[in-house]
Amino acid sequence: MPVIHSYIVAYDSGFAPNPFNGFCTLATCKPDIRKRASLGDWIVGTGSNRQGVRRGGFLVHAMRVREALTFVEYWNDPRFEKKKPNLHGSYRMACGDNIYCPLEGGGWRQLNSYHSGEDGTAVQKHISRDTSVDRVLISDDFVYFGAEGPKIPDVLRDAGLVLSGRGRKKVEEPASIANFETWLEGLGVKGYQGRPFDMVEAARKRK
C-alpha cells in the first residue's frame, strides 16, 4: 500500500525537486525521504509560511515515485542529461539537480550549481548530506505548481498532510491517501504547471 511523505518546501527554486524536462526528480536535500520512500509512494511538498513567501498550506508539488537511481546511474542516464546545470543558461538550465559526477578514485565532483558556493566552488557540507543517501527519486507521474498551487483542503490538512515546521510527515491511513488521490485527480492537470516561487520573484524584481 503506498504512503504519502509530506514536507514543507522551504526554498522553492526548481532545484529540489526539479520539475523540468518531463520528470520531477529529487536528487538533493531530503535524505530521509530519499532513503525511505518506496516505489509507488507519493512525495508531497507544501508551501513555506516564512515571511516574504506566505504559501503555507498550498500545494507546491506531488510526485509518485516511479524509479530510484544511484547517483552514478543518474549521472550516466541520457534522459537526465538536460538536468546537469548550466548557471549561464536559462533559469531552467541553471537549477539542474544532476550535479554529482563520479570520480575514478571514488567520491564526487560537484558541478557549479545551487549547492555550490557563490564563486562556484564545491560545498562539502552539501556534498556530504546529498550523497549520504545514494538514491535519486524519479517521477513521470507528477504535478508541479510552484508558487501558483491550490490550497490543500481542510480534510487533507486534518489528516496531517500539511506540516507546521521542518521534518517529514508520513501519512499511512488508506482513507486519507484515497482522499488525496481523488482530490489530486480532480485538479485535472499533470506535469509542470507553474513557476517556482524563486523564479516568480526574480521576474518581479526585474520589472
Predicted region positions:
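Short coil-to-beta transition motif at edge beta-strands of beta-rich domains
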Residues: R34-R50
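Residues that flank catalytic or metal-binding motifs in active/ligand-binding sites
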Residues: V3, L59-H61, D140
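Short consensus segments that form the blades of beta-propeller domains
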Residues: Q51-R55
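Short beta-strand-centered aromatic/proline hotspots
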Residues: G57-A68
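Short loop/turn segments at secondary-structure transitions that flank enzyme active sites
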Residues: D12-F15, N49, R66-F71, P150
